[in-house]
Each structure stands twice: as C-alpha cells, then as structure tokens.
C-alpha cells in the first residue's frame, strides 16, 4: 500500500566562515563514514569557489552485484525508507525487507533500441523513487534534497553487454549519501551555512535535528585544529604493469585500429602505495594541484579522494543545459631541473601540443564522440561546441580541452542523460562500446571508481559531476592510483607510458609528501 508522500522541513543557520574545508572536515567528521567533501576552484586562477560537506547522511543508496541497497542511517532516514518502499512497482523484487532494504530490478533487455532502453525500468529508478517520496521540494532551496557520491566505471555493465569482471576491492557500482546535515562554504563571499533537512513529522526527531544545528554552529565558531600528518620511514611504489608490458599493450591495441575495429582506446594501469592518512594526502594534493573538482569521500570500506580537471556531466535544471567537457591531449609542464616553472619552456610545450597532428586528431575525435552522446538526449538543433581546443594548466600537466553543450529533451531527466553518456569517451575511446570491450580484455579486472563520476545531484534535478581521475582509491591503507593514455594509430608506445606516469604523479607525490617520506620505486 502506498504511503503518504513526505513533506520535508529545512532548517538553516549561518556560522563562522573558516576558509579551510579540510580542517573543518577533520574536526567535525574525523573518521566518520558516509561523509563527503566536494570542492571547486577556478581553472586558471586556482581560486577556491565553493565547498559542500555532507556531515550527516540520513540515508545511503548503493548498487553492487545487481542488488540495490537502501539503508536508513538515522531515524530521520527511516521514515523516508518506509515511503520509498511503498512506491516500488511489483516487478521489483524485495530481497530483504529490513533496514537496509535490499531490492533487485529487472535485467535490462539488450534487444531494445537506445530510446527504449533509456525509458525502461532500471536501477536508476531506485534514485527516482527516493526523490518521488518527497512532495514539497520546490518550496525550499535547490540543495534541500542533496545527494553526493559516486557512479563507478563498472556501472556500465548493467546497461551494455560487457563482461562482468572480478575485483579484490569493495567499490560499489554506485554509492550516494542523502544529506541530513550539509555545510555550504561560499569562498567568494566568505559565507558559511549549515543546512539540516527533516524527512519526518516526529517532533522528537525534529528537535534532535535542531539541536544538531546548534551543536555544529558552536563547533564551527571555534578555531580549528591542524591536520595530523603521519610519518613513514619509506614508501614503496609498485605498478601492475611495467613500461615494457604497457608498451606491448599499446602495440597490440594499434593492430585493432589498423583493422578498423576502433579509432581509439584508453588502456590504464594501476600504481599502489601505502596511505595511512588519506585526509592529509588530500590536503597536500589540493594545495599543490587545485582543480575545478576536488573530492574526499569517506565510506565504511573505502576512501576516495582526488583533484580532477575534467567534468563528466553537468546539468542545469533551470536552463535544461547539459554539458560535457572533453579533455584529450596532455603534456608535462615546462619545469627546470630544480622543479621551478620555466615560462618560456612551458609556452613552447603548449605550442607543440596545439600544433601536434596526433593530439589534434585525438581531441577532435573525442569532441565528436561527446557531440554524438549529447545528440541522443538533446532537443534537435541545440547541441553545439561552445569552446574548442583551449589549454588548461595544472601542477604537473597541461591539457587540450573543449566544451560541448545542448538542451536536454523535456521527456528526459539527468539520470537518463548520465545513462546515455556513460562512460565518458576520454576514458574509454571510440567507438565507445567496442573500446570498453577491449579495455575489459586488456585490463582483466574492474576499474572501480577510476573513469566513473563523482559529484552531486539534487531532488530538483541539478547534476554536477567530474570524471574520477587524478585520484586515489584507498582500502586497507593501500592507495590505488590509476592512469591511462588515449591510444590512436600515431601513438608512440613509450610516450604514452610516460603520459600515464605523468598523470599519476601529482597524486603519488601528494601521498609521499603528506607522509614525509621518499618513494622507493619497485
């Protein structure tokens, strides 16, 4: 029986502005799981723009091994879980009726055309049913129902006929936290607001939420403690593929290109090293390599942090504009032997990259792939390239970038858009499905978070995500840093191997520096 939909309440308070979100996270969240910090910075000036922190989550929704798990984390979330369960259609199987609720959606038929598959019942409808459980979202601020978390690369196997691979890690196919307590820092205007969302009519629970607001206001009024930096004697770095092995993969991939099966593919490799204190490593990474998207996700079984230069998918519900930001073409920054920046050398490297036929061909191919992805979901005549072949600079590398936008069809939402576009072409290649098949064969294991997307969406339908690159996935105090290179016909194997190392370098160095140790290469 369907239950009455929820009327939410939102409580807000302004708190003392403090400019270091990582220090706030360290003081307020500490090692608490189901917490998340999302930050943004200007691409060129590197000024910090906004930080959003899920301090308390009411509910967690995740998907792994074809099972959706919805867990209420507070009494506030229990009420929402009850209404959500009543909205499920009969063809959704309830495997466990308790908290956490475990459900299974029908397997998507691979014989439907693209549009039919977009409209078919899928695991994304679990998120839609959660949002539909609330009836008065439009009365409140846009972030009153705020979900933050991860779509993994391997989520694609639920929508395309791709191999199911093994993994030793515990990364779900998607994992999102529904915020109960959200901190929003506006670094431009130097404001700090704590938002608490109530999903219940229980007066005792509402009082607890209001009390929580006051407790946090008091905590945030005090000076912050510095982040603890652990020291390790030495740090061993090892890789699952040597340069020689990776070069052989590139040579083999080029055979498929010559045969006409693909135009490009993006094989990756994994670097491993100890990471005792991920938060301190994240602090060093964002200081040395400020990026448009920076993130620190703390789950029970893993921690994920990074500083990504590349948007995955961005959607504005008000203008209905959908955006992809392809990055393809990479060079190291022009630095002297002592590590200082040589501006003349940096400019010459940029000029070489901008005029390199191989890099331009690869980049334009991926711009075209982004155009094709958006064509599936946009109103006719609205898709276009807003920016073509600009250069973005970061601490260790520079990139060729473009921006492709369009207006989402009125019969689709942000989840349809993500389903149609995943995974981003800059992490797969083209044609996309065949490239992903080859990646499965080459790599032989799940990618997990790498190449997926992390960010947030709201109950009103806003979406902002970045591609999970320049990141570390930490489990059992071991960090996995994954990086790849786009292989085309003109690729030189050793140069592509070097590129994959350059992409991983900023994160590896941040982990080493935060633990005050030298890296021993194995």
Curated annotation (Swiss-Prot):
Record text on cofactor binding: Binds 1 Mg(2+) ion per subunit.
EC number from the UniProt entry: 4.1.3.27
Transmembrane stretches, start-end: none
Domain of life of the source: Bacteria
SUPFAM superfamilies for the chain: ADC synthase
Protein's pathway: Amino-acid biosynthesis; L-tryptophan biosynthesis; L-tryptophan from chorismate: step 1/5
Keywords: Amino-acid biosynthesis, Aromatic amino acid biosynthesis, Lyase, Magnesium, Metal-binding, Tryptophan biosynthesis
Gene3D superfamilies: Anthranilate synthase
InterPro entries: ADC_synthase, Anth_synth_I-like, Anth_synth_I_N, Anth_synth_I_TrpE, Chorismate_C
UniProt enzyme class: lyase
Residues engaged in binding Mg(2+): 362, 499
GO MF annotation terms: anthranilate synthase activity; metal ion binding
GO BP term (any one): L-tryptophan biosynthetic process
Pfam families recorded: Anth_synt_I_N, Chorismate_bind
Oligomeric and partner information: Heterotetramer consisting of two non-identical subunits: a beta subunit (TrpG) and a large alpha subunit (TrpE).
Its job: Part of a heterotetrameric complex that catalyzes the two-step biosynthesis of anthranilate, an intermediate in the biosynthesis of L-tryptophan. In the first step, the glutamine-binding beta subunit (TrpG) of anthranilate synthase (AS) provides the glutamine amidotransferase activity which generates ammonia as a substrate that, along with chorismate, is used in the second step, catalyzed by the large alpha subunit of AS (TrpE) to produce anthranilate. In the absence of TrpG, TrpE can synthesize anthranilate directly from chorismate and high concentrations of ammonia.
Name of the protein this chain belongs to: Anthranilate synthase component 1
Source organism phylogeny: Bacteria, Pseudomonadati, Pseudomonadota, Gammaproteobacteria, Enterobacterales
